[in-house]
Amino acid sequence: MSTGAQALLRTLVDGGVRTVFTNPGTSEMHFVQALDGAPEMRAVLALFEGVATGAADGYARMAGTPGATLLHLGSGLGNGVANLHNARKGKSPIVNIVGDHATYHTQYDAQLQSDIETVARNVSPGFVRTSASTAQLGQDAAEAIAAAQGPPGQVATLILPADVSWSEGGSAAKVPERAAPPRASEETVQRLAGLIRGGKPGDTALLLGGRALRRDTLMLAGRVSTAAGTRLLAEVFPARIERGAGLPPVERLAYLAELASVQLRGIKHLILVDSKSPVSFFAYPGKASDLVPDGCEVHTLAAPDEDVLGSLDALVEALGAANAQPLLQEASRPKPPTGPLTAEKVCQAVAAAMPENAIVSDEAQTSGLTFASVSAGVPAHDVLTLTGGAIGQGLPVAVGAAVACPDRPVIALEADGSAMYTLQALWTMAREGLDVTVVLFNNRSYGILNIELQRTGAGEAGPVAKSQLDLSTPQMDFVQLALGLGVPARRVATGEDLTDALEHALAEPGPHLIETVVPSTVTGARLKVMPYALNALAKLPLPVARAIKGKLAP
Protein backbone atom coordinates (compact mmCIF):
# COMPACT_ATOMS: atom_id res chain seq x y z
CA MET A 1 0.00 0.00 0.00
CA SER A 2 1.34 3.45 -0.93
CA THR A 3 1.22 6.70 0.97
CA GLY A 4 -0.55 9.59 -0.65
CA ALA A 5 2.77 11.21 -1.57
CA GLN A 6 3.99 8.02 -3.23
CA ALA A 7 0.75 7.65 -5.19
CA LEU A 8 0.91 11.28 -6.25
CA LEU A 9 4.46 10.95 -7.54
CA ARG A 10 3.68 7.73 -9.40
CA THR A 11 0.66 9.38 -11.04
CA LEU A 12 2.78 12.35 -12.10
CA VAL A 13 5.56 10.21 -13.56
CA ASP A 14 3.18 7.86 -15.37
CA GLY A 15 1.31 10.90 -16.68
CA GLY A 16 4.43 12.34 -18.31
CA VAL A 17 5.35 14.88 -15.63
CA ARG A 18 9.05 14.23 -15.05
CA THR A 19 10.37 17.45 -13.49
CA VAL A 20 9.27 19.28 -10.35
CA PHE A 21 10.65 22.64 -9.23
CA THR A 22 10.51 22.80 -5.46
CA ASN A 23 10.60 25.15 -2.50
CA PRO A 24 9.24 22.85 0.21
CA GLY A 25 8.36 23.37 3.85
CA THR A 26 7.24 21.18 6.74
CA SER A 27 3.88 20.27 5.19
CA GLU A 28 5.63 18.85 2.11
CA MET A 29 8.18 16.61 3.85
CA HIS A 30 6.44 13.36 2.95
CA PHE A 31 6.41 14.36 -0.72
CA VAL A 32 10.12 15.21 -0.44
CA GLN A 33 10.87 11.86 1.21
CA ALA A 34 8.93 10.02 -1.50
CA LEU A 35 11.12 11.52 -4.24
CA ASP A 36 13.79 8.89 -3.55
CA GLY A 37 11.30 6.23 -4.56
CA ALA A 38 10.60 7.90 -7.91
CA PRO A 39 13.95 8.09 -9.72
CA GLU A 40 12.22 9.10 -12.96
CA MET A 41 11.24 12.42 -11.37
CA ARG A 42 13.88 15.16 -11.44
CA ALA A 43 13.56 17.51 -8.48
CA VAL A 44 15.10 20.97 -8.91
CA LEU A 45 15.41 23.09 -5.77
CA ALA A 46 14.79 26.85 -5.84
CA LEU A 47 15.55 29.30 -3.06
CA PHE A 48 12.40 31.32 -3.74
CA GLU A 49 8.97 30.28 -4.93
CA GLY A 50 9.02 32.80 -7.79
CA VAL A 51 12.03 30.98 -9.20
CA ALA A 52 10.27 27.61 -8.94
CA THR A 53 7.11 28.84 -10.68
CA GLY A 54 8.99 30.71 -13.40
CA ALA A 55 11.23 27.71 -14.02
CA ALA A 56 8.20 25.44 -14.37
CA ASP A 57 6.88 27.91 -16.95
CA GLY A 58 10.13 27.93 -18.94
CA TYR A 59 10.30 24.15 -18.78
CA ALA A 60 6.73 23.75 -20.04
CA ARG A 61 7.26 26.20 -22.90
CA MET A 62 10.25 24.25 -24.21
CA ALA A 63 9.42 20.66 -23.24
CA GLY A 64 5.84 20.81 -24.44
CA THR A 65 4.84 18.71 -21.42
CA PRO A 66 3.71 19.94 -18.00
CA GLY A 67 6.21 21.20 -15.51
CA ALA A 68 5.37 20.76 -11.84
CA THR A 69 5.94 22.89 -8.76
CA LEU A 70 6.00 22.09 -5.05
CA LEU A 71 5.15 25.10 -2.89
CA HIS A 72 4.60 25.60 0.84
CA LEU A 73 1.13 26.70 1.95
CA GLY A 74 -0.64 29.90 0.94
CA SER A 75 2.30 32.18 1.66
CA GLY A 76 4.55 30.10 -0.58
CA LEU A 77 1.94 30.20 -3.31
CA GLY A 78 1.69 33.95 -2.85
CA ASN A 79 5.44 34.29 -3.36
CA GLY A 80 5.13 32.39 -6.64
CA VAL A 81 2.00 34.06 -8.02
CA ALA A 82 3.70 36.60 -10.31
CA ASN A 83 5.34 33.96 -12.48
CA LEU A 84 2.26 31.74 -12.35
CA HIS A 85 0.42 34.77 -13.72
CA ASN A 86 2.89 34.88 -16.62
CA ALA A 87 2.40 31.15 -17.14
CA ARG A 88 -1.38 31.58 -17.23
CA LYS A 89 -1.12 34.31 -19.84
CA GLY A 90 1.28 32.16 -21.87
CA LYS A 91 -0.99 29.11 -21.63
CA SER A 92 1.82 27.01 -20.15
CA PRO A 93 0.87 23.56 -18.82
CA ILE A 94 1.83 23.43 -15.12
CA VAL A 95 0.76 21.14 -12.29
CA ASN A 96 1.04 23.48 -9.32
CA ILE A 97 1.21 21.41 -6.11
CA VAL A 98 0.69 23.41 -2.92
CA GLY A 99 1.11 21.76 0.45
CA ASP A 100 -1.39 22.56 3.20
CA HIS A 101 -1.84 21.86 6.89
CA ALA A 102 -3.36 18.52 7.85
CA THR A 103 -7.14 18.56 7.39
CA TYR A 104 -7.79 18.35 11.13
CA HIS A 105 -5.29 21.15 11.90
CA THR A 106 -6.92 23.91 9.85
CA GLN A 107 -9.58 24.56 12.51
CA TYR A 108 -6.92 26.01 14.82
CA ASP A 109 -5.95 28.88 12.46
CA ALA A 110 -2.21 28.38 13.03
CA GLN A 111 0.29 31.03 11.96
CA LEU A 112 0.57 29.83 8.35
CA GLN A 113 -3.11 29.05 7.86
CA SER A 114 -4.67 30.83 4.86
CA ASP A 115 -7.27 30.42 2.14
CA ILE A 116 -5.13 28.75 -0.50
CA GLU A 117 -7.97 28.11 -2.93
CA THR A 118 -8.83 31.81 -3.18
CA VAL A 119 -5.21 32.74 -3.89
CA ALA A 120 -4.89 29.94 -6.44
CA ARG A 121 -7.95 30.95 -8.46
CA ASN A 122 -6.15 34.09 -9.62
CA VAL A 123 -3.72 31.97 -11.63
CA SER A 124 -5.70 28.71 -11.95
CA PRO A 125 -9.22 29.78 -12.91
CA GLY A 126 -9.85 26.47 -14.67
CA PHE A 127 -8.66 23.97 -12.05
CA VAL A 128 -8.21 24.35 -8.29
CA ARG A 129 -8.76 21.31 -6.10
CA THR A 130 -7.98 20.39 -2.50
CA SER A 131 -7.53 16.65 -2.29
CA ALA A 132 -9.80 15.48 0.52
CA SER A 133 -8.54 11.92 1.00
CA THR A 134 -5.52 9.75 0.35
CA ALA A 135 -7.64 7.30 -1.63
CA GLN A 136 -8.76 10.09 -3.97
CA LEU A 137 -5.38 11.82 -4.36
CA GLY A 138 -4.18 9.79 -7.35
CA GLN A 139 -7.34 10.55 -9.31
CA ASP A 140 -7.16 14.22 -8.36
CA ALA A 141 -3.59 14.33 -9.64
CA ALA A 142 -4.51 12.61 -12.90
CA GLU A 143 -7.27 15.14 -13.51
CA ALA A 144 -4.89 18.00 -12.69
CA ILE A 145 -2.44 16.73 -15.32
CA ALA A 146 -5.22 16.46 -17.89
CA ALA A 147 -6.40 19.98 -17.10
CA ALA A 148 -2.86 21.37 -17.35
CA GLN A 149 -2.31 19.76 -20.74
CA GLY A 150 -5.40 21.35 -22.26
CA PRO A 151 -5.55 22.59 -24.92
CA PRO A 152 -5.06 25.30 -24.13
CA GLY A 153 -2.41 24.68 -21.51
CA GLN A 154 -3.12 26.08 -18.08
CA VAL A 155 -1.92 26.18 -14.48
CA ALA A 156 -3.75 23.43 -12.60
CA THR A 157 -3.42 23.82 -8.82
CA LEU A 158 -3.62 20.72 -6.63
CA ILE A 159 -3.66 21.44 -2.88
CA LEU A 160 -2.10 18.65 -0.81
CA PRO A 161 -3.02 18.48 2.90
CA ALA A 162 -0.21 17.00 4.97
CA ASP A 163 -2.25 14.08 6.34
CA VAL A 164 -3.51 13.20 2.86
CA SER A 165 0.15 13.05 1.84
CA TRP A 166 1.46 10.96 4.74
CA SER A 167 -1.43 8.52 5.17
CA GLU A 168 -1.50 5.00 3.70
CA GLY A 169 -4.11 3.97 1.17
CA GLY A 170 -3.03 5.85 -1.93
CA SER A 171 -2.97 4.44 -5.45
CA ALA A 172 -1.79 5.87 -8.74
CA ALA A 173 -4.35 6.81 -11.37
CA LYS A 174 -4.20 7.05 -15.13
CA VAL A 175 -4.51 10.42 -16.83
CA PRO A 176 -7.75 10.59 -18.84
CA GLU A 177 -7.32 10.39 -22.60
CA ARG A 178 -7.58 13.74 -24.32
CA ALA A 179 -9.90 14.23 -27.24
CA ALA A 180 -8.22 15.67 -30.31
CA PRO A 181 -8.90 19.42 -30.51
CA PRO A 182 -11.26 20.40 -33.32
CA ARG A 183 -9.95 22.35 -36.26
CA ALA A 184 -11.75 25.35 -37.72
CA SER A 185 -15.06 24.52 -39.34
CA GLU A 186 -15.26 24.25 -43.11
CA GLU A 187 -17.60 27.25 -43.15
CA THR A 188 -15.06 29.35 -41.23
CA VAL A 189 -12.18 28.29 -43.47
CA GLN A 190 -14.06 29.01 -46.69
CA ARG A 191 -15.34 32.36 -45.42
CA LEU A 192 -11.86 33.51 -44.43
CA ALA A 193 -10.35 32.23 -47.66
CA GLY A 194 -12.93 34.29 -49.53
CA LEU A 195 -12.05 37.42 -47.55
CA ILE A 196 -8.36 36.91 -48.23
CA ARG A 197 -8.87 36.32 -51.96
CA GLY A 198 -11.18 39.31 -52.26
CA GLY A 199 -8.81 41.85 -50.75
CA LYS A 200 -5.70 43.64 -51.91
CA PRO A 201 -2.24 42.62 -50.66
CA GLY A 202 -1.83 44.02 -47.16
CA ASP A 203 -5.56 44.34 -46.51
CA THR A 204 -5.55 41.15 -44.44
CA ALA A 205 -3.24 40.07 -41.63
CA LEU A 206 -2.83 36.90 -39.62
CA LEU A 207 -2.19 37.71 -35.95
CA LEU A 208 -0.27 34.69 -34.69
CA GLY A 209 0.15 33.65 -31.06
CA GLY A 210 0.73 30.57 -28.93
CA ARG A 211 1.29 27.42 -30.99
CA ALA A 212 0.97 29.36 -34.25
CA LEU A 213 4.54 30.63 -33.79
CA ARG A 214 6.24 27.24 -34.13
CA ARG A 215 8.09 26.14 -37.26
CA ASP A 216 5.36 23.95 -38.81
CA THR A 217 2.62 26.51 -38.35
CA LEU A 218 4.86 29.38 -39.43
CA MET A 219 5.56 27.59 -42.70
CA LEU A 220 1.83 27.28 -43.34
CA ALA A 221 1.26 30.94 -42.48
CA GLY A 222 4.13 31.79 -44.82
CA ARG A 223 2.38 30.00 -47.68
CA VAL A 224 -0.76 32.03 -47.04
CA SER A 225 1.33 35.21 -47.09
CA THR A 226 3.07 34.29 -50.35
CA ALA A 227 -0.12 33.26 -52.12
CA ALA A 228 -2.31 36.18 -51.05
CA GLY A 229 -0.11 39.01 -49.79
CA THR A 230 -1.37 38.52 -46.25
CA ARG A 231 0.71 40.20 -43.56
CA LEU A 232 2.11 38.08 -40.73
CA LEU A 233 1.97 39.65 -37.27
CA ALA A 234 2.73 38.19 -33.84
CA GLU A 235 1.30 39.08 -30.45
CA VAL A 236 3.35 41.50 -28.35
CA PHE A 237 4.79 38.96 -25.91
CA PRO A 238 4.71 35.41 -27.30
CA ALA A 239 5.31 32.50 -24.96
CA ARG A 240 7.66 31.03 -27.55
CA ILE A 241 8.49 32.14 -31.07
CA GLU A 242 10.76 30.28 -33.47
CA ARG A 243 12.66 32.73 -35.65
CA GLY A 244 15.86 33.33 -37.55
CA ALA A 245 17.43 32.22 -40.81
CA GLY A 246 15.30 29.82 -42.84
CA LEU A 247 12.01 30.70 -41.13
CA PRO A 248 9.24 33.05 -42.29
CA PRO A 249 9.78 36.49 -40.76
CA VAL A 250 6.94 37.67 -38.53
CA GLU A 251 6.46 41.23 -37.29
CA ARG A 252 5.81 41.37 -33.54
CA LEU A 253 3.40 44.04 -32.39
CA ALA A 254 5.12 46.76 -30.38
CA TYR A 255 4.63 47.15 -26.63
CA LEU A 256 3.79 50.85 -26.94
CA ALA A 257 0.19 51.15 -28.12
CA GLU A 258 0.95 54.14 -30.36
CA LEU A 259 3.54 52.09 -32.25
CA ALA A 260 1.31 49.02 -32.46
CA SER A 261 -1.44 51.21 -33.91
CA VAL A 262 0.92 52.20 -36.72
CA GLN A 263 1.57 48.53 -37.46
CA LEU A 264 -2.16 47.78 -37.57
CA ARG A 265 -3.21 50.81 -39.59
CA GLY A 266 -4.62 49.96 -43.00
CA ILE A 267 -5.62 46.40 -42.17
CA LYS A 268 -9.19 45.62 -43.22
CA HIS A 269 -9.41 42.06 -41.86
CA LEU A 270 -7.43 40.82 -38.84
CA ILE A 271 -7.51 37.03 -38.50
CA LEU A 272 -6.66 35.61 -35.07
CA VAL A 273 -4.71 32.37 -34.91
CA ASP A 274 -4.29 31.25 -31.27
CA SER A 275 -4.18 34.92 -30.25
CA LYS A 276 -6.35 37.67 -28.79
CA SER A 277 -7.55 40.86 -30.40
CA PRO A 278 -4.90 43.51 -29.64
CA VAL A 279 -5.36 45.94 -26.76
CA SER A 280 -3.06 48.43 -25.06
CA PHE A 281 -1.02 47.20 -22.11
CA PHE A 282 -2.44 49.91 -19.84
CA ALA A 283 -5.09 52.61 -20.01
CA TYR A 284 -3.89 56.14 -20.74
CA PRO A 285 -5.84 59.39 -20.39
CA GLY A 286 -7.65 60.23 -23.62
CA LYS A 287 -6.42 57.15 -25.51
CA ALA A 288 -8.32 54.09 -26.71
CA SER A 289 -7.62 50.71 -25.14
CA ASP A 290 -8.81 48.73 -28.17
CA LEU A 291 -6.07 48.84 -30.83
CA VAL A 292 -8.14 47.46 -33.70
CA PRO A 293 -8.26 50.28 -36.28
CA ASP A 294 -11.55 51.78 -37.39
CA GLY A 295 -13.02 49.87 -40.29
CA CYS A 296 -11.13 46.67 -39.49
CA GLU A 297 -13.05 43.45 -38.85
CA VAL A 298 -11.64 40.84 -36.48
CA HIS A 299 -12.09 37.14 -37.29
CA THR A 300 -10.95 33.93 -35.60
CA LEU A 301 -9.46 31.05 -37.58
CA ALA A 302 -8.38 29.00 -34.55
CA ALA A 303 -9.03 29.69 -30.87
CA PRO A 304 -6.55 28.49 -28.23
CA ASP A 305 -8.59 25.31 -27.61
CA GLU A 306 -8.67 24.39 -31.31
CA ASP A 307 -6.28 22.62 -33.69
CA VAL A 308 -4.05 25.48 -34.83
CA LEU A 309 -1.90 23.44 -37.22
CA GLY A 310 -4.90 21.71 -38.80
CA SER A 311 -6.81 24.97 -39.16
CA LEU A 312 -3.93 26.72 -40.92
CA ASP A 313 -3.43 23.69 -43.14
CA ALA A 314 -7.11 23.83 -44.13
CA LEU A 315 -6.78 27.54 -44.96
CA VAL A 316 -3.74 26.82 -47.14
CA GLU A 317 -5.72 24.17 -49.03
CA ALA A 318 -8.74 26.46 -49.45
CA LEU A 319 -6.49 29.14 -50.96
CA GLY A 320 -4.77 26.65 -53.27
CA ALA A 321 -1.49 27.65 -51.64
CA ALA A 322 -0.07 24.21 -50.85
CA ASN A 323 2.73 24.69 -53.39
CA ALA A 324 3.40 28.34 -52.58
CA GLN A 325 6.91 28.87 -51.29
CA PRO A 326 6.98 30.92 -48.10
CA LEU A 327 9.31 33.88 -47.94
CA LEU A 328 12.15 32.83 -45.65
CA GLN A 329 14.49 35.00 -43.63
CA GLU A 330 17.91 35.19 -45.27
CA ALA A 331 20.95 34.36 -43.16
CA SER A 332 22.81 37.39 -41.86
CA ARG A 333 24.83 38.27 -38.81
CA PRO A 334 25.97 41.67 -37.55
CA LYS A 335 29.63 42.39 -37.01
CA PRO A 336 30.86 42.37 -33.41
CA PRO A 337 30.74 45.91 -32.00
CA THR A 338 33.72 47.95 -30.90
CA GLY A 339 34.25 50.78 -28.47
CA PRO A 340 32.27 51.80 -25.37
CA LEU A 341 29.10 49.80 -24.86
CA THR A 342 25.55 50.94 -25.38
CA ALA A 343 22.44 48.79 -25.09
CA GLU A 344 22.30 48.63 -28.89
CA LYS A 345 25.89 47.39 -29.05
CA VAL A 346 25.17 44.71 -26.46
CA CYS A 347 22.28 43.42 -28.59
CA GLN A 348 24.58 43.51 -31.62
CA ALA A 349 27.29 41.53 -29.82
CA VAL A 350 24.84 38.86 -28.66
CA ALA A 351 23.45 38.50 -32.19
CA ALA A 352 26.98 38.27 -33.60
CA ALA A 353 27.83 35.45 -31.19
CA MET A 354 24.52 33.52 -31.26
CA PRO A 355 25.12 29.79 -31.64
CA GLU A 356 22.80 27.55 -33.63
CA ASN A 357 19.63 26.33 -31.94
CA ALA A 358 19.90 28.75 -29.05
CA ILE A 359 17.08 29.62 -26.66
CA VAL A 360 16.75 33.27 -25.67
CA SER A 361 14.90 34.29 -22.52
CA ASP A 362 14.26 37.97 -23.18
CA GLU A 363 13.60 40.28 -20.24
CA ALA A 364 15.92 43.06 -21.36
CA GLN A 365 13.09 45.62 -21.29
CA THR A 366 14.07 48.95 -22.91
CA SER A 367 17.69 47.85 -23.28
CA GLY A 368 16.67 45.08 -25.68
CA LEU A 369 14.64 47.17 -28.13
CA THR A 370 17.00 46.47 -31.05
CA PHE A 371 17.62 42.79 -30.40
CA ALA A 372 14.81 41.54 -32.67
CA SER A 373 16.08 43.50 -35.66
CA VAL A 374 19.80 42.74 -35.31
CA SER A 375 19.17 39.03 -34.67
CA ALA A 376 16.61 38.50 -37.46
CA GLY A 377 18.99 36.55 -39.71
CA VAL A 378 21.09 34.65 -37.18
CA PRO A 379 20.78 30.84 -37.00
CA ALA A 380 17.28 29.62 -36.10
CA HIS A 381 16.47 29.99 -32.42
CA ASP A 382 13.60 30.28 -29.94
CA VAL A 383 12.70 33.43 -28.02
CA LEU A 384 10.71 33.29 -24.77
CA THR A 385 9.13 36.58 -23.71
CA LEU A 386 7.34 38.22 -20.79
CA THR A 387 3.85 36.88 -21.50
CA GLY A 388 2.04 38.40 -18.54
CA GLY A 389 4.12 41.51 -17.98
CA ALA A 390 5.06 40.55 -14.39
CA ILE A 391 8.81 41.19 -14.26
CA GLY A 392 11.17 38.75 -12.61
CA GLN A 393 10.52 36.05 -15.19
CA GLY A 394 13.68 36.10 -17.30
CA LEU A 395 16.14 34.23 -15.08
CA PRO A 396 13.69 31.56 -13.81
CA VAL A 397 12.38 30.89 -17.34
CA ALA A 398 15.99 30.44 -18.46
CA VAL A 399 16.43 27.85 -15.69
CA GLY A 400 13.40 25.90 -16.87
CA ALA A 401 14.37 26.09 -20.53
CA ALA A 402 17.86 24.80 -19.75
CA VAL A 403 16.45 21.89 -17.74
CA ALA A 404 14.05 21.02 -20.57
CA CYS A 405 16.68 21.31 -23.31
CA PRO A 406 20.08 20.40 -21.82
CA ASP A 407 21.70 20.12 -25.26
CA ARG A 408 20.79 23.67 -26.30
CA PRO A 409 22.56 26.88 -25.22
CA VAL A 410 20.36 29.31 -23.30
CA ILE A 411 20.96 33.07 -23.31
CA ALA A 412 19.13 35.25 -20.80
CA LEU A 413 18.91 38.92 -21.77
CA GLU A 414 18.16 40.51 -18.42
CA ALA A 415 17.49 44.05 -17.20
CA ASP A 416 18.96 45.08 -13.88
CA GLY A 417 15.71 45.93 -12.11
CA SER A 418 13.96 42.78 -13.31
CA ALA A 419 16.91 40.60 -12.31
CA MET A 420 16.63 41.66 -8.68
CA TYR A 421 13.13 40.16 -8.40
CA THR A 422 14.39 36.59 -8.79
CA LEU A 423 18.18 36.77 -8.58
CA GLN A 424 18.14 33.53 -6.57
CA ALA A 425 17.72 31.75 -9.92
CA LEU A 426 21.49 32.08 -10.37
CA TRP A 427 22.01 29.71 -7.44
CA THR A 428 19.82 27.07 -9.09
CA MET A 429 21.74 27.50 -12.35
CA ALA A 430 24.98 26.85 -10.48
CA ARG A 431 23.62 23.96 -8.43
CA GLU A 432 22.26 22.19 -11.53
CA GLY A 433 25.20 23.10 -13.79
CA LEU A 434 22.85 24.64 -16.36
CA ASP A 435 24.24 25.97 -19.64
CA VAL A 436 22.88 29.50 -19.29
CA THR A 437 24.68 32.70 -20.28
CA VAL A 438 23.15 35.72 -18.56
CA VAL A 439 23.78 39.04 -20.30
CA LEU A 440 22.90 41.64 -17.68
CA PHE A 441 22.02 45.16 -18.84
CA ASN A 442 22.86 47.47 -15.94
CA ASN A 443 21.54 50.93 -16.81
CA ARG A 444 20.86 51.69 -13.16
CA SER A 445 17.27 52.75 -13.71
CA TYR A 446 13.75 51.53 -14.32
CA GLY A 447 14.01 52.73 -17.91
CA ILE A 448 10.54 51.65 -18.96
CA LEU A 449 8.96 53.58 -16.08
CA ASN A 450 10.73 56.76 -17.12
CA ILE A 451 8.98 56.37 -20.47
CA GLU A 452 5.65 55.54 -18.85
CA LEU A 453 5.90 58.58 -16.58
CA GLN A 454 5.97 60.73 -19.70
CA ARG A 455 3.23 58.79 -21.53
CA THR A 456 0.70 58.83 -18.70
CA GLY A 457 0.71 62.62 -18.58
CA ALA A 458 1.31 62.53 -14.84
CA GLY A 459 3.05 65.91 -14.98
CA GLU A 460 6.58 67.11 -14.36
CA ALA A 461 8.49 64.74 -12.10
CA GLY A 462 10.05 66.24 -9.00
CA PRO A 463 13.06 64.89 -7.11
CA VAL A 464 11.05 62.39 -5.06
CA ALA A 465 9.26 61.03 -8.14
CA LYS A 466 12.54 60.71 -10.04
CA SER A 467 14.15 58.91 -7.12
CA GLN A 468 11.56 56.13 -7.35
CA LEU A 469 12.81 55.22 -10.83
CA ASP A 470 16.54 55.50 -10.10
CA LEU A 471 18.64 52.44 -9.24
CA SER A 472 22.05 54.14 -9.11
CA THR A 473 22.38 54.65 -5.33
CA PRO A 474 23.74 52.41 -4.02
CA GLN A 475 25.15 50.83 -7.17
CA MET A 476 24.37 47.15 -7.60
CA ASP A 477 27.37 44.93 -8.29
CA PHE A 478 26.04 41.99 -10.27
CA VAL A 479 29.46 40.40 -10.59
CA GLN A 480 29.76 40.06 -6.82
CA LEU A 481 26.13 38.99 -6.51
CA ALA A 482 26.61 36.27 -9.11
CA LEU A 483 29.87 35.04 -7.59
CA GLY A 484 28.17 34.85 -4.21
CA LEU A 485 25.54 32.56 -5.74
CA GLY A 486 28.11 30.32 -7.42
CA VAL A 487 28.03 31.68 -10.99
CA PRO A 488 31.26 32.82 -12.71
CA ALA A 489 30.89 36.47 -13.70
CA ARG A 490 32.70 39.41 -15.24
CA ARG A 491 31.94 43.04 -16.03
CA VAL A 492 32.65 44.48 -19.48
CA ALA A 493 32.66 48.04 -20.80
CA THR A 494 33.64 47.69 -24.47
CA GLY A 495 32.40 45.77 -27.47
CA GLU A 496 35.70 43.93 -27.74
CA ASP A 497 35.55 42.74 -24.13
CA LEU A 498 31.91 41.69 -24.47
CA THR A 499 32.68 39.63 -27.59
CA ASP A 500 35.50 37.89 -25.72
CA ALA A 501 33.28 37.24 -22.69
CA LEU A 502 30.50 35.80 -24.85
CA GLU A 503 32.87 33.50 -26.70
CA HIS A 504 34.19 32.19 -23.39
CA ALA A 505 30.78 31.77 -21.77
CA LEU A 506 29.22 30.02 -24.76
CA ALA A 507 32.20 27.66 -25.14
CA GLU A 508 32.45 26.63 -21.48
CA PRO A 509 29.69 24.45 -19.98
CA GLY A 510 27.70 25.73 -17.04
CA PRO A 511 26.27 29.14 -16.16
CA HIS A 512 27.99 32.49 -16.65
CA LEU A 513 26.95 36.08 -16.03
CA ILE A 514 28.26 39.04 -18.03
CA GLU A 515 27.43 42.44 -16.59
CA THR A 516 27.29 45.27 -19.12
CA VAL A 517 27.08 48.79 -17.73
CA VAL A 518 25.18 50.80 -20.33
CA PRO A 519 23.42 54.16 -20.48
CA SER A 520 19.63 54.20 -20.51
CA THR A 521 18.19 53.87 -23.99
CA VAL A 522 15.76 56.80 -23.76
CA THR A 523 16.96 59.82 -21.77
CA GLY A 524 17.17 63.60 -21.88
CA ALA A 525 15.58 65.39 -24.81
CA ARG A 526 14.61 62.11 -26.46
CA LEU A 527 12.61 61.14 -23.37
CA LYS A 528 10.92 64.56 -23.23
CA VAL A 529 10.00 64.48 -26.92
CA MET A 530 8.80 60.86 -27.01
CA PRO A 531 5.18 61.39 -25.84
CA TYR A 532 4.70 64.18 -28.39
CA ALA A 533 6.18 62.03 -31.16
CA LEU A 534 3.99 59.09 -30.18
CA ASN A 535 0.85 61.23 -30.08
CA ALA A 536 1.63 62.62 -33.53
CA LEU A 537 1.92 59.23 -35.21
CA ALA A 538 -1.82 58.80 -35.77
CA LYS A 539 -1.95 62.05 -37.78
CA LEU A 540 1.04 61.36 -39.99
CA PRO A 541 0.94 59.65 -43.40
CA LEU A 542 1.42 55.92 -42.94
CA PRO A 543 4.86 55.70 -44.62
CA VAL A 544 6.16 58.50 -42.39
CA ALA A 545 4.61 56.96 -39.27
CA ARG A 546 6.14 53.58 -40.10
CA ALA A 547 9.56 55.14 -40.59
CA ILE A 548 9.36 56.80 -37.17
CA LYS A 549 8.14 53.56 -35.62
CA GLY A 550 11.15 51.81 -37.13
CA LYS A 551 13.48 54.30 -35.48
CA LEU A 552 11.83 54.07 -32.06
CA ALA A 553 11.32 50.29 -31.99
CA PRO A 554 12.96 48.51 -34.95
Regions found by a protein language model. Give the residues of each.
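Phosphate/pyrophosphate-binding active-site segments
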Residues: A135, I159, D274-G368, V464, ...
